[in-house]
Amino acid sequence: MKKVVLAAGGTGGHIVPAALLCQVLADRGYRCVLYTDQYFLQYTARFPGIKGYVLLPLCKRSGGAVRLLKFCALLAYSCVLSYIKLRSLKPDLVIGFGAYASFPVLLSAWLMSVDAVLHEQNSVMGRVNRVFAGYARVIACGLPLRTVGNKLAHKVAHVGVPTDVKKAVKRPLAGDSINLVILGGSQGLCTFGKTFALAIAELPTNIRGRVFVTQQCGKGQLEVITELYARHGIKHKLSGFFTDMQNIIGEADLIISRAGATTIAEVMAAGRPAIYVPYERSSCSHQLYNAQLIESLGAGLCIEERTLDVSSARDALTNLLGDRNKLQEMSCNAAKHAMPDADAQFCAIVDGLLKG
């Protein structure tokens, strides 16, 4: 039985596609082990089939000099730990999905001369993937990469982002109610949530009265936004973290979200129209480039956070929710450009390397 190690961590954008591929490869007869970090514990209920995983003792890099020193020490320890474990396991292939949690595993693969495959979800390659791009046999990408050097171009394969979200049957604004979904990313980076909440409260009465809001909120915003919606009679469901993303996305008439590639893949797989608000501090502005790409495909609207205020949010919502044809056009474009067979395409790459 061929052994495959997958490595991802930090955010759901890295963890979810890695966990999905881990399950699919295991179903195809591979022995799979997922190397990740503490953030995976938020997703164990979603992936109950994954029993073989290793939690690397990593922490966030940001937070001052002391935190940086702690991060470096834990990263070094994780490198040693990964090397010892991989020497014992003797994997046939290592697949890195980005984030610092993948660094120790990919470094160990390089030291052991084990073949490696990278998956870059975003349109701009992340730091860890850039480090190992030269070593990797294949660079699988979720979105078309903006810049790829001539030395790497032959390695790139556009496979999409593995997702378990299926195409929704429901058409946007097909019923009387309007299901608005506001997501903040797996790290709860929904600083724009209150802005859109205030904008929803200012929508024309004929639209506001039909709205049901499902919204991911940080702890500091939950009480404030709950009170705001209650005061304006807006039906709502708020939470810091949702586990049933497939149903939430599938039932949405319009989604408002950050522009991480995994979220985009889920939204497009469901064929949902969306407003994307890129996280300003995303590395190399990758969320901005992601959102601009989707906007150019006619599958979503990109609003930069620096230009976002209550007025612009209200106008965008009013224009879209008042135009069923526009939402349906965006929905069709999202479904048209989705890659629902990403896991199968990725498996074909793995099969080619290990069975070919």
Curated annotation (Swiss-Prot):
It is an enzyme of class 2 (transferase). SUPFAM superfamilies: UDP-Glycosyltransferase/glycogen phosphorylase. Pathway: Cell wall biogenesis; peptidoglycan biosynthesis. InterPro entries: GlcNAc_MurG, Glyco_trans_28_C, GlycoTrans_28_N. It is found in: Cell inner membrane. One of its GO terms (biological process) is regulation of cell shape. It catalyses: di-trans,octa-cis-undecaprenyl diphospho-N-acetyl-alpha-D-muramoyl-L-alanyl-D-glutamyl-meso-2,6-diaminopimeloyl-D-alanyl-D-alanine + UDP-N-acetyl-alpha-D-glucosamine = di-trans,octa-cis-undecaprenyl diphospho-[N-acetyl-alpha-D-glucosaminyl-(1->4)]-N-acetyl-alpha-D-muramoyl-L-alanyl-D-glutamyl-meso-2,6-diaminopimeloyl-D-alanyl-D-alanine + UDP + H(+). GO terms for molecular function: UDP-N-acetyl-D-glucosamine:N-acetylmuramoyl-L-alanyl-D-glutamyl-meso-2,6-diaminopimelyl-D-alanyl-D-alanine-diphosphoundecaprenol 4-beta-N-acetylglucosaminlytransferase activity; undecaprenyldiphospho-muramoylpentapeptide beta-N-acetylglucosaminyltransferase activity. UDP-N-acetyl-alpha-D-glucosamine binds at residues 11-13, 122, 186, 287. Its EC number is 2.4.1.227. It comes from the Bacteria. It is a peripheral membrane protein. GO terms for cellular component: plasma membrane. Keywords: Cell cycle, Cell division, Cell inner membrane, Cell membrane, Cell shape, Cell wall biogenesis/degradation, Glycosyltransferase, Membrane, Peptidoglycan synthesis, Transferase. Pfam families: Glyco_tran_28_C, Glyco_transf_28. Cell wall formation. Catalyzes the transfer of a GlcNAc subunit on undecaprenyl-pyrophosphoryl-MurNAc-pentapeptide (lipid intermediate I) to form undecaprenyl-pyrophosphoryl-MurNAc-(pentapeptide)GlcNAc (lipid intermediate II). Belongs to the glycosyltransferase 28 family. MurG subfamily. This is UDP-N-acetylglucosamine--N-acetylmuramyl-(pentapeptide) pyrophosphoryl-undecaprenol N-acetylglucosamine transferase.
